[in-house]
Amino acid sequence: MGLPQNKLSFFCFFFLVSVLTLAPLAFSEIFLEEHFEGGWKSRWVLSDWKRNEGKAGTFKHTAGKWPGDPDNKGIQTYNDAKHYAISAKIPEFSNKNRTLVVQYSVKIEQDIECGGAYIKLLSGYVNQKQFGGDTPYSLMFGPDICGTQTKKLHVIVSYQGQNYPIKKDLQCETDKLNHFYTFILRPDASYSVLVDNKEREFGSMYTDWDILPPRKIKVKNAKKPEDWDDREYIDDPNDVKPEGFDSIPREIPDRKAKEPEDWDEEENGLWEPPKIPNSAYKGPWKAKRIKNPNYKGKWKNPWIDNPEFEDDPDLYVLKSIKYAGIEVWQVKAGSIFDNILICDDPAYARSIVDDYFAQHRESEKELFAEAEKERKAREDEEARIAREEGERRRKERDHRYGDRRRRYKRPNPRDYMDDYHDEL
């Protein structure tokens, strides 16, 4: 027996909605999704770069000091003043005719002082055991901090073998909580940079990187045409100065003033009332201002097509990607990298960030606040002990020097003089 008509219609509707909802996911492609769960060491190769010099650091698999989820572990830089390099090989792909999404999370738990927390996409063959700072890359993206002044968010792309940093001044987060950084590059060469799913910057590779010459340039030595009227307002030609306007005095005699009773005309002359401001005086006459009907706007140097510009429709296309890597140097270690995603679906990347914040953000903040409270109490106690120790040492020093002064006190010559005078 078949389904009733109304149930069959509902089933068809539900099936259609499901297909439409899942269709984008079915056609999206994930090239790398790494949450550093079991077996991650088999996927990632720790480089020996700088190891012979004793300058190579190691990574620790941990959730950190204030994890939103203690079971969600990443890899943390572990040794101070070291170079870190680790990479994973991924199925080779090209972003030609597709959107590229690069996303990861990093929690900079430490007072880093100076160091990077970015990731790189690599092309061609890479000896992963020798992967280091001089290894060519196709994209470098993420925070770089040094002191209190530099809090830069790098977006560096490689074009024809040369690296080009973004011209805009992008800032990274420094509050010791977990943050997601997302870079989206589209086939029309437009891009977006997101931090925690909030768009921090957007634009075009044509304008925000100095890769190609600009499409338009200003005309050199251009001059404003003589008939160009850039006066937005002009005097009203129909406004006429009232008759007698210029004869109105600025001040007039005070009519309420009275001659003093003791005024002596022979001695002081004829009394005159003091002057007061004239309320009828309007100052110099000025015609009313009206909109200029011939106003053409402020003159600007005209733009023309740049003869040196040659378009590259593949400007957005990176060399085929084969590896993802972390290569940084840090004065103070302690940054946790996690949730690395390389795909072509911005919606899927957004869902990962949304899920993390919905499930773990509040607990992470609570643990961080508690850790900060304990740190503050510990520092206050250490400061108290240091003050008490300093006071104790000061008292000992004063006591010791006091005894020495009394022991080696020099006689006062006046004492001898007094004895001499007494004898006299």
Swiss-Prot record:
One BP term from GO: anthocyanin-containing compound metabolic process
Biased composition, class Acidic residues, residue ranges: 228-237
Keyword terms, alphabetized: Calcium, Chaperone, Disulfide bond, Endoplasmic reticulum, Glycoprotein, Lectin, Metal-binding, Repeat, Signal, Zinc
Chain segments carrying region Disordered: 228-275, 368-424
Observed effect of gene inactivation: Loss of seedling growth inhibition in response to the pathogen-associated molecular pattern (PAMP) elf18 and increased susceptibility to phytopathogenic bacteria.
Residues binding an alpha-D-glucoside, per UniProt: 118, 120, 137, 144, 327
Signal peptide (UniProt feature, chain positions): 1-28
Record protein name field: Calreticulin-3
Organism name: Arabidopsis thaliana
